[in-house]
Amino acid sequence: MKNRLVLIVLLVASFFIFLFFYNKYRVAPSFQLFQMPLYDVQGNQTSLESFRGKKFIITFYASWCRDCLVELKALNEIKSARFPDVEIICITDDPPEKLSDFIQKKNYPFRFFRSTKDFPELKIYSIPVNYLVNSSGQVVMEKVGAIDWEDNSLVTRAMNLLQ
């Protein structure tokens, strides 16, 4: 009887561990970035189509996400020196007033947009999620979780991928 109880507890624990990692590292493999409708801070609808032909980094973030805030701060610190010709595009599913407050409070030189859908509807279950897109419109790197922008080798790799 004791062995059966231990087995049941292990199976249940294994199931929840599996679900945690499955959701944490799951990103939509055929994500249509350029067709995704977005709203700017003024409430105007737009899409990433207007960035076609440019190099850009997209980060899906939330104002309450600690890892997202750390990553945005690090990106801000290296943007002008390491990525002067790369647009940084930040997409949130926060309400419009939170987006506006966040932009005013942080004053980052990034482009901020609000998704028309909640992240789970986009199959984004863990944030931040980052995409590096070259000037040909190809996603050259995607990463679930914060990128360590203080790691010089990673920044160099990102710069090379964006070329």
Which positions does each model-derived feature cover?
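C-type cytochrome heme c attachment motif
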Residues: 63-70, 129
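Positively charged n-region of N-terminal signal peptides that target proteins for export
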Residues: 1-4
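Short active-site neighborhood of thiol/selenol oxidoreductases, capturing the structured segment around
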Residues: 47-66
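Thiol/disulfide oxidoreductase modules built on the thioredoxin-like
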Residues: 104-108, 114-160
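Hydrophobic beta-strand anchors of alpha/beta hydrolase catalytic cores
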Residues: 57-58, 88, 130
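Structural microenvironment flanking redox-active thiols in thiol-disulfide oxidoreductases
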Residues: 69-106, 117-120
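Hydrophobic membrane-insertion alpha-helices, especially the h-region
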Residues: 6-20
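N-terminal "domain-start" segment that seeds a small globular fold
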Residues: 17-48
